[in-house]
Amino acid sequence: MNPIVKSFEYGQHTVTLETGVIARQADAAVLASMGDTTVLVTVVGKKEAEAGRDFFPLTVNYQEKTYAAGKIPGGFFKREGRPSEDETLIARLIDRPIRPLFPNGFKNEVQVIITVVSVDPQIEPDIISMIGTSAALAISGIPFSGPLGAARVGYINGEYVLNPTVAQIETSQLNLVVAGTASAVLMVESEAQALPEEVMLGSVVYGHDQQQVVINAIAEFKAEAGKPMWDWTAPVQDETLVAQIKELAEAGLGDAYKIQVKQDRYAQVAVVKAATKEALLASNPNIDLREVDNLLGSLEKKVVRGRIIRGEPRIDGREPDMIRALSVLAGVLPRTHGSALFTRGETQALVTCTLGTERDAQKIDSIMGERTNRFMLHYNFPPYSVGETGMVGSPKRREIGHGKLAWRGINAVMPSAEEFPYSVRVVSEITESNGSSSMASVCGTSLALMDAGVPIKTSVAGIAMGLVKEGDDFVVLSDILGDEDHLGDMDFKVAGTRGGITALQMDIKIEGITKEIMEIALQQAYGARVHILNVMDQAIGSHRDDISDHAPRITTIKINPEKIRDVIGKGGAVIRALTEETGTTIELEDDGTVRIASSNGEATKEAIRRIEEITSEVEVGRIYNGKVIRIVDFGAFVNILPGKDGLVHISQISDERVANVSDHLELNQEVAVKVMEVDRQGRVRLSIKEAQTKEAAAE
């Protein structure tokens, strides 16, 4: 075994790429490390494509092994199970920038597997996974227009920080990941604290500039370790068939794309394509219909893009910077804690908000450590939203990714636990879709949170931008349709407030996207965002003054931390009885904070009363009404407060001589007792006769 190793400094860390020792039967295998965080990236591709395949079957699997953090998995089987949400999101993060770097017409199956084998809790594994993937593809011999670089950018005290640690991210106003080639940015994923457009754009440029060291290092690594390039050539188009299809379908497709209603437009496009195939089959019964479909798709793309570049109206008749008609409704469902229906053209989201206690927060145990999410956002995309049938079940990768993007857009304006001690779950049901349903989810979430009485800092809106570029000519499109997303060169989603950007996601399919184009897109997105916010504010401009009657009301009280064990009781008996008998949810913190949650105000008051009884101190000289709980030869034990018992000595039962305690007292008898003493060990001495004397004197 002859390892080939390449090391370089990258920000605060040393990056090492190694090949030639592990997984040598894969087309390429790279052990990539950044500090103590190490991933094994393998690439395998099939030399031949399946006959008739009309898509590129790229699979990216990212898996975190618990042994990487020195942990044993939980559960019965004690092994890793299905991918977590974090694993799914990182797999998508890697997939998005590498996919456009494979050549057009390449249909061979390629599988990339990234395995996290060691992790430093201060260095997240996503950036080194992207770097390792780029290096493995570069040396594999598979056709790939890399290398690709990747960087995380933070913004702390007005300065950009390259690849900040986990601790630094906690104080950063920005968490941005950017990936690209030497000449072009291909992908951006970010979360920000309402930063201005110029700061966000600057972070993208900074990250792309800094990652050139990665690109250069991988190029050197490839020169030393790269395998021979595959003998693959792109399929040659049948120009005669291209001309025939253009003659038969161009005019019809042009007319079809003037129909503004999506379903009607799709129906007419299908008619044009069917007529074209019929005409071609009549002249050549052996024609390859898959090739015809591909060429019709290319012609469709040229027709739509050409109209936009020439300055003609868009598919639905809008100008480039126009937003579709908006409909905004808050409080649309009677029993939910908060709800909203947000409609933009043919895209619609029904969003609900549910409030819960700290116990309802999401507990996550990953290789990076344990964390708790008080704010959850789940995005569902049922098949009926696009007029189709399909499987309904657990969320797919796309749904998880869109939900996380919407979460990032909203998280910056969420209140702290001190301001609002509730767990919050938002669900966005996409009921109609024709472009940018994730941004509709952002708008709907902002509205539903306000309807639920969640004191978010301000309203948030999101917009999806697109781009059509031919040579030096380009047009930036606001509020893109699904077709414009599919046929365009860029998908650029921006969420934010009037004050700045909270989330930015960008996927670019071509090179040549300049800083100036991104600047225009951001400014155009700002105008669109403000327009949407103005409409949203007309429906609900600020959060409700109170939460829903159907939501649990959380009341917070403070007790002496030393009394926590008294409230819990032996084996949890006291707190269990409290919650069952009052119907409330009670949560305790180590500092003595007690949160009581219930939708019934009287139940909350009763729980507070009983907790105060349990935690109150026994006062010497005070008379209590207690209950006899045990009788012994030398006296009786009386319970005066929950968890507080005292001894009435036989000499303190009566002024008369008592020979037998049972002659004067019985179990469960209620008696008035006076506290005579509490000794250093907390033992309480009680007197019945002193209580009677005091009561008689009071009369």
Curated annotation (Swiss-Prot):
It catalyses: RNA(n+1) + phosphate = RNA(n) + a ribonucleoside 5'-diphosphate. GO terms for biological process: mRNA catabolic process; RNA processing. Its EC number is 2.7.7.8. One of its GO terms (molecular function) is RNA binding. Mg(2+) binds at D485, D491. It comes from the Bacteria. Residues 552-611 form the KH domain. Pfam families: KH_1, PNPase, RNase_PH, RNase_PH_C, S1. GO terms for cellular component: cytosol. Gene3D superfamilies: GHMP Kinase, N-terminal domain (3.30.230.70), K Homology domain, type 1 (3.30.1370.10), Nucleic acid-binding proteins (2.40.50.140). Residues 621-689 form the S1 motif domain. Its cofactor is Mg(2+). Keywords: Cytoplasm, Magnesium, Metal-binding, Nucleotidyltransferase, RNA-binding, Transferase. InterPro entries: ExoRNase_PH_dom1, ExoRNase_PH_dom2, ExoRNase_PH_dom2_sf, KH_dom, KH_dom_type_1, KH_dom_type_1_sf, NA-bd_OB-fold, PNPase. Its main location: cytoplasm. It is found in: Cytoplasm. Belongs to the polyribonucleotide nucleotidyltransferase family. Involved in mRNA degradation. Catalyzes the phosphorolysis of single-stranded polyribonucleotides processively in the 3'- to 5'-direction. PANTHER family: POLYRIBONUCLEOTIDE NUCLEOTIDYLTRANSFERASE (PTHR11252), POLYRIBONUCLEOTIDE NUCLEOTIDYLTRANSFERASE 1, MITOCHONDRIAL (PTHR11252:SF0). Component of the RNA degradosome, which is a multiprotein complex involved in RNA processing and mRNA degradation. This is Polyribonucleotide nucleotidyltransferase. The lineage of its organism: Bacteria, Pseudomonadati, Pseudomonadota, Gammaproteobacteria, Alteromonadales.
